[in-house]
Amino acid sequence: MPLLPEESQWELLTAAGLRNDFQAAWIEGDDRDAIAAELRVDATTTLECDLATALRWMGVGSPTPILWVGPHAPGWTFALALSWDGADFGALDRRVFDFCYARELDEFYGVPGVYGEEGLDDLYLNDDQGDESDLDPHLVAVGRLTGRFVDRAWLAERRTLCRVAS
């Protein structure tokens, strides 16, 4: 795997429609049923869809969090929160790289779990709070640690749109 992706991670996500707030997690594990159970996903209300379809649910004001969940790389699952209430990714009993960026405030919160990891010394990783310019180095770090960067093929994959049970 190369040290850097072919394209800017944040620019790819922005071009795909993630222009506003962004809360997502890279969750260690391939067992999506177990991860869905830990996230308290309501299995009766799911839809397999692409990112463009999932983004139609962004900010709809759902009383319960809406997630888009699916494979990222071998050993890793990706979850995108589509409602700002989001999900409690920190409550998962497994390794998680949790991102949170509020565009309106231009505020990015550092990603717990990446600091101190080997092989990231060449990246400037602000470990507290930052702005939009801090996103790409953190996305590159997560790509290195999970074994896959975001790319156009990744963006085209279908994942599961679901609600978190209240």
Residue locations for each model-derived region?
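Long, compositionally biased intrinsically disordered terminal regions
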Residues: D93-S166
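Hydrophobic alpha-helical segments that drive targeting, anchoring, or assembly
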Residues: P2-L120
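Actinobacteria-biased recognition of intrinsically disordered, low-complexity terminal regions
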Residues: M1-G17, D151-S166
